[in-house]
Amino acid sequence: HLDLPAFNHHRASDDAATVGYMLIPFWKMLHERGIHTLQAVNKEMEKLRPLGSKSNRFPKHIIILARNKVGLKNLYQLISASNLKYFKRVPTIPKSLLLEHREGIIVGSACEAGELFRAVLRGESEEKLMSIADMYDYLEIQPIGNNAFLMRNGTVDTEEGLRDLNRRIVALGDKMGKPVVATGDVHFLEPDDALFRSIIMHARGFDDAEQQAPLYFKTTDEMLEEFSYLGEEKAREVVITNPNMIADSCERMKAFLSEKGTYAPTFPGANDELRNMALKKAHEIYGDELPEVVQKRLDKELNSIIGNGYSSLYLMAQRLVHKSNSDGYLVGSRGSVGSSFVANMAGITEVNALQPHYVCPNCRHSDFDIDRTKYACGVDMPDKDCPVCGAKYKKLGSEIPFEVFLGFKGDKTPDIDLNFSGDYQPVAHKYVEVMFGEGHAFRAGTISGVKDKIAYGYVRSYCEANGINAGKDEMDRMVQGCTGVKKTTGQHPGGIVIVPKENDIMEFTPVQYPADRSEGDTITTHFDFHAMDDRLVKLDILGHDDPTVLRMLKDITGLDPQTIPLDDPETMKIFRTSEPLGVTLDELDCDVGSIAIPEFGTTFVRQMLKDTRPTTMEELLRISGLSHGTDVWLGNAQELVLSGTATLSQVICTRDDIMNYLILRGGDPSMSFKTMESVRKGRGLTPEMEEHMRSIDTPQWFIDSCKKIKYMFPRAHAAAYVMMAFRVAYYKVHMPLAFYSVYYTVRADAFDIAQAEGGAQKVLANINAIKKKGNDADKKEEDLLTILEVVFEMNKRGIELLPVDLYKSKASQFIIEDGKIRPPFSSV
């Protein structure tokens, strides 16, 4: 601002000289204000000080285009710095930083909020304007409608005055030899879309939201007409010639590195380490000479994993799980990683993906000669003794194809999702950074749009404020126009993006803090991870209650959850009746015992259990798949089961069912896989897929069911969740005091002692009071309702809730005391 000469900061002699240079223009400013004494300076400062506050230091807008890959990286570095180091209400870029990263980028002067336009508006001298414009590669002018607000606020008198501002910028460009470009400052596509922007801006508190500038995407003819006052030749130059020249100077490139496909992290010697690890474990379980089924599956998977460069990803997950287990916390697998037998042998998942089989824990003899049409889950097979040594066989296998995880050609990017204890999740996140080094592990960023319910609130508020009496169809149209508009940025609850050591995150994405915090340790990708999920590997390290619950139950009871038999008959019964609990729960309109069991405790799933009355682990697994999909059970499989068209074992429950079923009927494996992928993503069936299904006599109900599905769980995910849930259920049946105390402790935030004390009848009255509210019950009451149902069941089982005691209660932990449960202070 003062045109000071270059100098070395914080060097006394330079600082003193610079202050001297500053004084000269300051004296001039003082004289212009009629100030000639020190007292007058102090008095004037009272008026000037508010003008210099941070709230009045508005940054100027600029446009930055990446000309080439060097420029793209510089652009990402500027975006990152603006979000991490220079965020002041909005991301800002110091001019000095922009000049440091000038290579490969093109800088435009932007809209009315740009430095140049504002200087023109202030009537700065030509010399000053040339000094400002010197930094820009091209100068921008925009339709006068964009700046009509300057007439409304009295800054410019007429439309011709707005045109004169543009004329001055054009003349400046001509004099300096800089291209002038007509731009639209486009914020929406069609003119009518201005209404949606008005609604959004009204929701954000703008007083002039209804007075929208025509910031729609104009055609070339519209732009030529808009700038016709410059003359035909000049109008074509700013609308067509110069924009094309700038566009042509930019290389065609993608937003992130893509030459190699997926850029996966690597560990030295990972291929051999993973192979040796998997084979060692397989030999420990299945003997020195591996059964053909085991050897074939290992060879197939290892060749695909190693051949596609995913060994290091497996090792990374293995090390995380091993560390968590060593620290005393179980880890549950999510997603389709349980489809990999190698993952099971490496200790990443408990799910054994092989076909159902017996194996002897003593002599390692195995039996794979099982009727696979009768058993899909090894746990459901009858007990059997080893014919070699007489020891009781272990029953393993979940019948899950590997292709669900990596595809038939190993070309599907693997996504390893792991459920860590919520208490342990931060430790696991830090350990990833230790493994790969600082600057190579980032939280996966998310971009959230306006949800339809929020959009409805925006529209209703806008209509009320403007006296608009809109009908339902018009309201729906306005809601639809606002739904999905970017609202904020955030972070994936557990996703960690890994950048290989030989790469830089700036080759893929800028980085930033999540929108709800402007500092701290959490740095996320600037792009939504889904935009680049085929380029960088994401490891999902999620926090989950189940591992925490099982750790606490183990500490209280001394029973290791991994030793719990997954075929315990009494535990299996509670998924079809409350009889093993010794109570009936008719008052809750519930005749199963699965209340408070993960994945099976909600009213929705309890109704599914009532409809299906499962008796096997396989049926529980299928119910889990049905309950987590979208349009898989309701209006689909439920109707097929209740009408007798198909049984629970026949309907589509998990995505694997589609591929397995089609291949079993003689379908082409590759087409069967593509069909599964299309259906599970909610894309339905292509004519080619439907023709393939009919060629192998697929029943019409199966085809129709595929068309209805919007999303499906993988079988491996369901298997992992059901194993965890069954273990928790075992404690509920056989060790109820420990179960209830831990359940309440983990959900202490929702517990309200005033509502939960007083015995079964009082608790039931409180339950009914909340139910009577229906949809008017708030989230807190809905969470409390679940807690109260558990308390009611516990009371009926003869377990009392003691009062909070100043001397006996803990801070936040429910404790067992004389066959009863004492709440903590946090429950008050």
Model-flagged regions — what are they?
Residues 70-193, 276, 280-316:
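Domain-core and long-helix interface of multi-subunit machines
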Residues 31-56, 495-513:
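Common nucleic-acid-contacting/processivity interface regions adjacent to the catalytic cores
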Residues 23-25, 154-156, 193-201, 346-349, ...:
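Short low-complexity, flexible loop/linker segments enriched in glycine and/or proline
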Residues 2-46, 249:
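Acidic, Mg2+-coordinating catalytic module of metal-dependent nucleases/exonucleases
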Residues 62, 194-277:
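Active-site or pore-adjacent capping/gating segments
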Residues 8, 12, 178-192, 333-334, ...:
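Short acidic/histidine-rich active-site segments
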Residues 28, 49-87:
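Hydrophobic or amphipathic alpha-helical targeting/insertion segments
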Residues 188, 199, 207, 265-828:
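Noncatalytic, beta-rich nucleic-acid-contacting surfaces in large DNA/RNA-processing enzymes
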